[in-house]
Amino acid sequence: MTVDAVRVELGARAYEVRIGPGLIARAGAEIAPLLRRPKVAILTDETVAGLHLDPFRQALAEAGIASSALALPAGEATKGWPQFARAVEWLLEEKVERRDVVVALGGGVIGDLAGFAAAVLRRGVRFVQVPTTLLAQVDSSVGGKTGINTAQGKNLVGAFHQPSLVLADIGVLETLPPRDFRAGYGEVVKYGLLGDADFYEWLEEAGPRLAADAEARQRAVRRSVEMKAEIVARDETEEGDRALLNLGHTFCHALEKATGYSGRLLHGEGVAIGCALAFELSQRLGLCAQEAPSRLRAHLRAMGMKVDLRDIPGDLPSAEALLALMAQDKKVVDGKLRFILARGIGQAFVADDVPGDVVRTLLEDALAQR
């Protein structure tokens, strides 16, 4: 299999997302052209370090690149002030200079945190994303959104800071636990839902074999990245079209906050549930036929994924409390909730005027089924 390259066109800050097998083994040769001195600082997590850090550092060493690494605890709880401060202090102790490169080796948590650290360190150093989860490869590693969570909500502190290169090694996805792979699929299916009905139709057929079929997996990652790159190139800082990428996320972020950013609900699982709720909301508002949310739920069920609020273990707050959590979402404009709704599969759009009582009733009905 060959390596695919998708270019994110952002003028002088354009970069490539390289997708294919064996990219970690070739990481030194891939990263070397970016370096002004043969040294990088790697931020990773303890789980990824045990699987991929040694091969990655060996690949760098073979290209004559020295490296140091800090492994943070794995999990969403790491994406907050304490570990962020620890990472920045460590980068300063490592004497990372403005012309150097920081490497984010891991999933979305590490990519977001390391990218934000790179954005603020010495007012901005370059960084390379080496995403090791399906979710990070198709979504969080591309587009320059970086940040951390706070007590008030998810991703409320951060910066737009584009990577200089993304290396998406699809081979490492074979080491993912099945639940993590399925969670990442929540972001893959989102792309078909928001703007490519043909891709969604292909996923209905190919989705169940992605974990075992490297060629299908690479196609799914490539098409997802192509769609994100196109949208980011048009709207880097989310003033317009880029908001479409938040399909399912208004519900998702509230549910993640309600479950304490814990193992009860992974981000991609929340996205899948959020997409199902967004399509159900669209149907209730008369925007799409009932067939669309029913078809989506059937596909997610066939993939073994969480689909409804009843699939989340443990207690959940009331519909009113979930609405209050949504009001903290960073997509709120002039105090109004923004939802990504759909007129059908592949036909998403941004809506600023969704009646709160319709959302409340939707949530009440979903909670009543638990």
From Swiss-Prot:
Keyword Zinc listed: yes
Residues binding NAD(+): 108-112, 132-133, 145, 154
BP term (GO), one: chorismate biosynthetic process
Cofactor detail note: Binds 1 divalent metal cation per subunit. Can use either Co(2+) or Zn(2+).
Signal peptide coordinates: none
Binding-site residues for Zn(2+), renumbered to this chain: 187, 249, 267
Subcellular location: Cytoplasm
Documented EC number(s): 4.2.3.4
Needed cofactors: Co(2+); Zn(2+); NAD(+)
SUPFAM superfamilies xrefs: Dehydroquinate synthase-like (SSF56796)
Catalytic activity: 7-phospho-2-dehydro-3-deoxy-D-arabino-heptonate = 3-dehydroquinate + phosphate
Broadest EC class assigned to this enzyme: lyase
GO molecular function, one term: metal ion binding
GO cellular component entries: cytoplasm
Keywords: Amino-acid biosynthesis, Aromatic amino acid biosynthesis, Cobalt, Cytoplasm, Lyase, Metal-binding, NAD, Nucleotide-binding, Zinc
Pathway(s) this gene product operates in, as recorded in its UniProt entry: Metabolic intermediate biosynthesis; chorismate biosynthesis; chorismate from D-erythrose 4-phosphate and phosphoenolpyruvate: step 2/7
InterPro entries: Dehydroquinate_synthase, DHQ_synth_AroB, DHQ_synth_fam, DHQS/DOIS_N, DHQS_C
General function of this protein: Catalyzes the conversion of 3-deoxy-D-arabino-heptulosonate 7-phosphate (DAHP) to dehydroquinate (DHQ).
Recorded family membership: Belongs to the sugar phosphate cyclases superfamily. Dehydroquinate synthase family.
Protein name per the record: 3-dehydroquinate synthase
